[in-house]
């Protein structure tokens, strides 16, 4: 079951053609990740309090249809892969029932500038 994040396109997110600039999709994905973690009781601020940072290793997005100013859309987020050191999320952006973008991001955790294994309490939150 995906985590669903709902949002409306703001005017400043559009480009000269009146569509959402491609870079903003990655902001939407980051917002969805943050809300997903918050909904699990483990927001980024809690990880930072533990001295951990969530670092992006790679990101991919396939754009299928445009979004326009004032469109309401949903980001459906799923945890696709989880290992001791990395985790991967997939995203599908829907406008009504139409998929307008598909993406994934891979992450790791860093403490004191070095990649570390994902702490047990974070693994439990991600698995749940």
Curated annotation (Swiss-Prot):
Entry's EC annotation: 3.1.-.-
Enzyme class: hydrolase
Keywords from the UniProt entry: Hydrolase
Matching InterPro entries: 4-hydroxybenzoyl-CoA_TE, HB-CoA_thioesterase_AS, HotDog_dom_sf, YbgC/YbaW
MF annotations from Gene Ontology: fatty acyl-CoA hydrolase activity
Gene3D superfamilies for this protein: Hotdog Thioesterase
Active site: residue positions: 15
Superkingdom of this protein's organism: Bacteria
Annotated family: Belongs to the 4-hydroxybenzoyl-CoA thioesterase family.
Name this protein carries in UniProt: Putative esterase aq_1494
Classification of source organism: Bacteria, Pseudomonadati, Aquificota, Aquificia, Aquificales
């Amino acid at each position: 079951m995906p985590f669903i994040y709902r949002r409306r396109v703001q005017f400043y997110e559009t480009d000269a053609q009146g569509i959402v600039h491609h870079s903003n999709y990655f902001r939407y994905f980051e917002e969805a990740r943050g809300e997903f973690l918050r909904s699990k009781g483990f927001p980024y601020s809690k990880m930072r309090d533990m001295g951990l940072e969530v670092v992006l290793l790679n990101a991919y997005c396939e754009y299928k249809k445009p979004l326009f100013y004032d469109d309401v859309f949903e980001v459906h987020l799923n945890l696709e892969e989880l290992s001791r050191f990395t985790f991967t999320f997939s995203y599908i952006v829907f406008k009504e029932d139409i998929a307008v973008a598909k993406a994934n991001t891979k992450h790791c955790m860093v403490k004191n500038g070095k990649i570390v294994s994902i702490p047990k309490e974070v693994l439990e939150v991600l698995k749940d």
